[in-house]
Amino acid sequence: ISIEEFKKNKKIIEKLKVKLTLFEMLTLIYCLSASKLKNVSYALVEAGLLYAKDSTRLWDQPKCQIITNINQQHLEWVKPKTLQAICQQKVGYLSKKTTIYIGKQEPKTKKIIKKILRKNPSKKIYYGDAWSLKKKGNCRIYKDKKGKLVLKSNKIFSDGIWQNVGLAVKVARDFNISKKN
C-alpha cells in the first residue's frame, strides 16, 4: 500500500466518525486497499493476539487460518497469565469452516492447542505430521508428501522465521501456488 493510498483510506475512515483502535484502523485501511486489487487470488491478514475481539475476525469461512509458534512472549496481555490463556486467545475462536495450519510448537503447547481445537470441526494440519523442516548446513530441507525442497537464504538467521517460511511453503504447496507467484 502506498503512502498516498494509506492517507486516502485514512481520510475516508475518519469521515465515518467511528472510534477505532490503531489496529482496527490499520485493518480497515488494508481491507479497503485490498478490495481494489486486480488479479489477486489470496489476501494474507495477520490477526492480533487477542483474537476473540480482533478486528480481523471478518470472515466466517476463510480459505485457511495459520497458527505460527505460540510461546510465553504474550503473557503480559492475557489473564490469567498462562500458556493455556494465550492458546485460548490464539486458537479458541478460529473458524469452524476452514483448514487450520498449525506451525511448529513446543510439545506442551501442541497438546494444549489440540485440546482446544478438538471441538472445532475444521481440518487441522500440524507441523511434524504433514510436513517438516530440518536444518542442514546453511540451508533448510522442507519435506511433505509432495517431496523435498531445499530452502536457502543468507538473510534469515532466526529459527522462528525459518519455521514461518516452512509453514508458508506448506500452505502455498497445498493451494498449488507456483514458485513464481
Give short role names for the model-derived ranges.
Residues A34-E46, P62-N181:
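Acidic, Mg2+-coordinating active-site environments of NTP-dependent enzymes
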Residues I1-D60, N69-Q72, E76-K81, A85:
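ATP-dependent carboxylate-amine ligase catalytic core
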